[in-house]
Regions:
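An N-terminal, globular interaction/scaffold subdomain
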Residues: 1-140
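Gly/Ser/Thr-rich loops at beta-strand to alpha-helix junctions
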Residues: 54-57, 119-120, 144-147, 170-171, ...
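Structural alpha-beta junctions
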Residues: 67-78, 132-137, 158-164, 184-189, ...
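Conserved short internal alpha-helix adjacent to the catalytic or cofactor-binding core
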Residues: 124, 260-265
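Long, compositionally biased intrinsically disordered terminal regions
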Residues: 245, 253-254, 266-270, 277-348
Length: 348
């Protein structure tokens, strides 16, 4: 194995000229020992591009996608682009490796690009040139979407099959509006990690209407109270999970619902309790943090839904793996986004 590969696989970021990235990657894999001993497998199923603004976000994205690559091998391209920084365009390569089931190392490539000032405009064509052909592309936008520079976002999205965001970091409804426009006007399918976190709550809530006597009562849903823990109740992104849940209920019931929100300051972020008022019934879904379960209470009958045996908050890398392993796009998220935007305007 080449010295270049061993340096890259050890976690070292090897600096290269951005015009020679592909050539250097080819050199990294070119070694007699690879073919003769088959000790390392080069693997990729996705191109995953992470866009960041700060060094902290860059390091976070690198660590997260390194973990995700063990489950979904990928060519990782991490971009740090700051138009307000000094003009620069630099690049590095490294390798993410793990031990496969046969005991051999499975490795995928990571490319880091740092752009500042006017050279940020070179990022989209450079990224496009580095994508492995005939392989799906996911763009993970780390942090807040720059709604004031939507054209730059859409340029990066041109080759992307998926846009991955985490709306808990959005500071304005205009960020959600960008996601809606992506869903409506492009071939890129949006995926929101904040929406995926709600899956257990949606499953538990749907179980309320599983009993035969409850199946027709969804249409009688009149009032909903949603209680959630937030770290800062004034920050827009902290409210989106509750807004998503309310929008989903409205979409499923097909009726106007009176929704109230109870946001409580806590370090343990997320929904904690939902109360549903039906025509002649009441139901609650509640998180038990100590037991890590969601329980339902329908007119005094308490149960833990079979489909939600343990309620665990997933790590970001696990949520991203979930998106990459999903065979198709999420059809429900685009459906609820218009409702979410309406509710967001009402909460202002």
């Amino acid at each position: 194995m080449t010295d270049l590969f061993e340096r890259a696989a050890s976690g070292e970021e090897v600096r290269v000229d951005y015009t020679a990235i592909e050539r250097t990657l080819a050199d990294m894999w070119r070694a007699d020992g690879v073919d003769e001993q088959h000790t390392v497998t080069r693997a990729a199923l996705w191109n995953v591009v992470a866009h960041t603004l700060t060094p902290q976000h860059h390091a976070y994205a690198s660590e997260t996608l390194s973990k995700a690559a063990a489950a979904v091998p990928q060519r990782t391209i991490i971009v740090r682009a700051d138009p307000d920084a000094e003009a620069e365009l630099s690049s590095w390569i490294s390798a993410n490796c793990h031990i496969g089931g046969d005991g051999k190392r499975v490795c995928s490539e990571e490319i880091a690009i740092v752009a500042g000032g006017t050279r940020v405009t070179r990022v989209p064509p450079l990224v496009n040139a580095l994508l492995i052909p005939d392989m799906p592309v996911a763009l993970w936008w780390v942090g807040d979407l720059p709604h004031e520079n939507a054209e730059y976002v859409h340029t990066l999205l041109d080759p992307a099959d998926r846009l991955i965001v985490d709306s808990v970091h959005f500071n304005d409804p205009a960020d959600l509006a960008i996601v809606k426009r992506v869903a409506d006007d492009t071939g890129t399918a949006p995926a929101d990690l904040n929406w995926i976190r709600l899956e257990e709550w949606r499953t538990a809530t749907a179980s309320v209407f599983d009993p035969p006597e409850m199946r027709d009562k969804l249409r009688t849903l009149k009032r909903v109270q949603i209680a959630a823990n937030v770290q800062d109740e004034t920050y827009f992104g902290e409210r989106i999970e509750s807004l998503f849940f309310a929008s989903w209920l409205m979409a499923q019931s097909g009726a106007e619902i009176d929704v109230t929100f109870d946001l409580r300051r806590s370090d343990r972020r997320g929904l904690i309790r939902v109360e549903l008022e039906l025509a002649d019934s009441k139901a609650t879904i509640e998180r038990d943090h100590d037991r890590c379960v969601l329980s339902t209470n329908i007119d005094g009958r308490i149960s833990v839904p079979d489909a939600v045996t343990r309620s665990q908050l997933k790590n970001i890398d696990e949520l991203i793996v979930r998106v990459l392993k999903q065979p198709g796009s999420d059809r429900l998220l685009p459906k609820i986004l218009p409702v979410t935007l309406q509710l967001a305007q009402q909460m202002k």
